[in-house]
Amino acid sequence: MKEKVVLAYSGGLDTSIIIPWLKENYDLDVIAVCVNVGQGDDMDYVKTKAIKSGASKIYVEDVKEEFVVDYLYKAIKSEALYEQDYMLGTSFARPLMAKKLVEIAHKEQAKYICHGCTGKGNDQVRFEVGVKAQDPTIKIIAPWRIWDIKSREDAIDYAKKVGVEVPVTKKKIYSVDRNLWHVSHEGGDLEDLKNEHKEDMYFMVTPPEKAKDEPTYLEIYFEKGAPVKINGEFLNPVDIIDKLNTIGGENGIGIADIIENRLVGMKSRGIYETPAGTLLYAAHKKLESVTLDKYTYQYKKLVSAQYGELVYNGLWFTALREAIDAFVDKTQENVTGTVKLKLYKGNIKPCSVDTEYALYDEGISSFGESELYSHKDAEGFINLFGLPCKIKALKNF
């Protein structure tokens, strides 16, 4: 009996040609695994294609709700970003995929896990560190670090040679990653920084100048930091993301053209569509500004940056990530309420916040007198607060 390899399978260019390559070079029984995180593919077609390409078996794991509840809700609560811009759509999906690959490898008693990540990218790190953290005995096969194929053009030529159909041409050669949270576009003419990216590549977002000519008002209700209602309607987690993707997309919201510093050293350019995430982060940030005290709010910004870097670097299965999640959950205890947004041609304007946990007090914050605060109190505070500056000035006077 042949030994088994579990392949992270998408049906795209790289994983389509890996099946015949594995059989040709390793003589392994290939078990394909497609983890459905909302990439929008025809899963019946993916199943058929995997078998036609030479896989002995194909698993399609629908984990969309798990992806939202156990991963994206953590993104929203933490407002995690990498380098202040990237909303980590790929990064949050990879640990869940790694988890499912290991589960199926155990079920199939497979000694190997294979992925189609490029040797220059971050995903190879995320997959392999994720696998090692769960089962250090599983061996990894990474074709892009081994085979003679050096470019996506070479990969297309190899696909034609072995008779594997691929949904990519040499004319339009973007590498696309899609899930519930985002769509990313890399490669092709994007690699020349002098090129403006082409708006016809968008999957989810209408270009802002072509978006609706009238504003859209949107209400999002959060409960302990997680979104549960849209415009007053309770929705399940997956439907919330889908609905916000639609609303944000038709209003031209959620496009980012980013130059990022990859974990492996080089810079890369990506075009990201994240309409739901952009709306949720904007609303969540507004609600936190009202419900968190000053020091928690400011410290959480530091933690959010660290959290984003951890997730980006593939360190999901770590004690630090779990500890940060525990801290974030504590901060979210009173992050409950409704935020109203006004959307227009790529812009988001927060309109109002309605929450019983507001730390904002109109009476204290107004310019008039208050039982808790007198204008006269400011004089003593200023004298003490400014004392170090005054002493230094006196010494140097």
Curated annotation (Swiss-Prot):
Gene: argG
Enzyme Commission code: 6.3.4.5
Pathway assignment: Amino-acid biosynthesis; L-arginine biosynthesis; L-arginine from L-ornithine and carbamoyl phosphate: step 2/3
Binding-site list for L-aspartate: T118, N122, D123
PROSITE patterns in UniProt: ARGININOSUCCIN_SYN_1, ARGININOSUCCIN_SYN_2
Coiled coil segments of this chain: none
Pfam families per UniProt: Arginosuc_syn_C (PF20979), Arginosuc_synth (PF00764)
Protein name according to UniProt: Argininosuccinate synthase
Organism of provenance: Clostridium botulinum (strain Okra / Type B1)
Top-level division of the source organism's lineage: Bacteria
InterPro entries per the UniProt record, alphabetical: Arginosuc_syn_C, Arginosuc_syn_N, Arginosuc_synth, Arginosuc_synth_CS, Arginosuc_synth_type_1_subfam, AS_cat/multimer_dom_body, Rossmann-like_a/b/a_fold
GO cellular component: cytoplasm
GO molecular function: argininosuccinate synthase activity; ATP binding
Catalytically driven reaction(s): L-citrulline + L-aspartate + ATP = 2-(N(omega)-L-arginino)succinate + AMP + diphosphate + H(+)
EC top class named in words: ligase
Entry binding sites for L-citrulline: Y86, S91, N122, R126, S175, S184, E260, Y272
NCBIfam families per the UniProt record, alphabetical: argG (TIGR00032), PRK00509.1 (NF001770)
Listed GO biological process terms: argininosuccinate metabolic process; L-arginine biosynthetic process; urea cycle
Family of this protein: Belongs to the argininosuccinate synthase family. Type 1 subfamily.
Record text on subunit structure and interactions: Homotetramer.
Cell compartment(s), UniProt: Cytoplasm
Lineage: Bacteria, Bacillati, Bacillota, Clostridia, Eubacteriales
Residues that coordinate or bind ATP: A8, Y9, S10, G11, G12, L13, D14, T15, S16, G116
